């Protein structure tokens, strides 16, 4: 176990806390029944990052973390500071202030080390028309210093993972947009990085290509335990692949955390600290009659009906919701669905951001 650092007198851990390599973890009071859960170190940590262009604060005191196996959506409108932040993480720009760390290595003080453990896929990347797929990957493997069997193994690994093996001899300027994006991802993976930064990887792809690329990114996190930071304007796509997100606007992080945490904050912002929720109720028939009945019930507001489906706000908790459903059934309404509406990532984005541009 790591040696505990000295702490100030006014900043002591309580008796039921210990310090792991990353965070404080509370343990059971009974020493005979201690279950210690070690918290993973962040593989990507952004600390108070700033990038100014004259008076424009493109990145303004940005901080967030990401861990192994996470796919983090980096979300914001055009001009919010996403690409500038990503370029700093990729060591392509220096910050005005602050720092970021990839697997503990500073992008400011140790950029060479960072480049060896980070893969960056920009929104557009160069392709050389006189190369085929395998020659293109070979070029980047050599650029990372791979030689002999190590280089051949790296190329084969990428061809198999991206399912480009059958296109290995195909000229890259004849590839479809979807296959070109797979090649770009393969180039990013050639040195087997721990952290991946993907800037709009699904831009311009047809629906099938987007789904296939999404599946590949999911495999990187779930099976290979990579950390993935991904930006996109297609929020429905991010909502299906990401388990965490950081929302940025006008250079500032508005909220970051797991998707569930962000949805909870969105609900809190929209409704304060009440127990209200949006309910969805579907009946087999009698939808118009059900609508009139629901409007007469306590805690109900904002009722909307689409054929046999009702959506309405309910200003009370779980027990009154259960009672409402019970009374619906007692009234012989043929209810086949009754649930809280799940807010999408797009709902959260619209609720949290204010449409500010720089």
Segments (PLM) and residue ranges:
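Conserved ABC ATPase signature
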Residues: 171-178
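Conserved catalytic motifs of ABC-family nucleotide-binding domains
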Residues: 192
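Conserved ABC ATPase "signature" region
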Residues: 138, 142, 149-167
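Catalytic Walker B motif of ABC-type/P-loop ATPase nucleotide-binding domains
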Residues: 196-199
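ABC-family P-loop ATPase nucleotide-binding domain
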Residues: 1-50, 355-358
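ABC transporter nucleotide-binding domain
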Residues: 214-315
């Amino acid at each position: 176990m790591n040696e505990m650092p000295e702490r100030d007198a006014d900043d002591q851990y309580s008796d039921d806390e210990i310090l792991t390599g990353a965070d404080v973890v509370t343990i059971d009071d009974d020493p005979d029944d201690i279950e210690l859960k070690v918290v993973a170190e962040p593989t990507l940590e952004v600390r108070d990052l700033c990038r100014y262009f004259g008076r424009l604060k493109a990145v303004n005191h940005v901080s967030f973390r990401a861990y192994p196996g996470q796919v983090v959506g980096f979300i914001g409108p055009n001009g919010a500071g996403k690409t500038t932040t990503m370029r700093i993480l990729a060591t392509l720009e220096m910050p005005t202030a602050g720092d970021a760390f990839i697997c503990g290595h500073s992008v400011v003080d140790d950029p060479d080390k960072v480049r060896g453990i980070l893969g960056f896929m920009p929104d557009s990347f160069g392709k050389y028309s006189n190369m085929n797929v395998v020659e293109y990957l070979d070029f980047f493997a050599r650029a990372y210093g791979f030689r002999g069997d190590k280089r051949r193994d790296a190329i084969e690994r990428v061809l198999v993972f991206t399912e480009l093996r059958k296109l290995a001899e195909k000229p890259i300027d004849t590839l479809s947009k979807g296959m070109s994006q797979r090649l770009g991802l393969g180039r990013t993976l050639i040195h087997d990085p721990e952290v991946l930064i993907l800037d709009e990887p699904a831009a311009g792809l047809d629906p099938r290509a987007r789904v296939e690329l999404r599946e590949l990114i999911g495999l990187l996190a779930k099976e290979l335990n990579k950390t993935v930071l991904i930006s996109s304007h297609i929020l429905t796509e991010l909502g299906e692949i990401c388990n965490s997100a950081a929302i940025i606007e006008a250079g500032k992080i508005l909220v970051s955390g797991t998707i569930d945490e962000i949805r909870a904050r969105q609900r809190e912002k929209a409704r304060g600290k009440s127990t209200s929720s949006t309910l969805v109720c579907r009946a087999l028939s009698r939808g118009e009659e059900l609508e009139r009945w629901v409007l007469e019930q306590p805690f109900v507001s904002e009722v909307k009906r689409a054929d046999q489906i009702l959506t309405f706000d309910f200003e009370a908790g779980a027990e009154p919701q259960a009672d409402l459903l019970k009374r619906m059934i007692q009234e012989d309404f043929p209810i086949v669905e009754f649930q809280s509406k799940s807010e999408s990532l797009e709902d959260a984005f619209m609720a949290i951001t204010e449409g500010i541009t720089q």
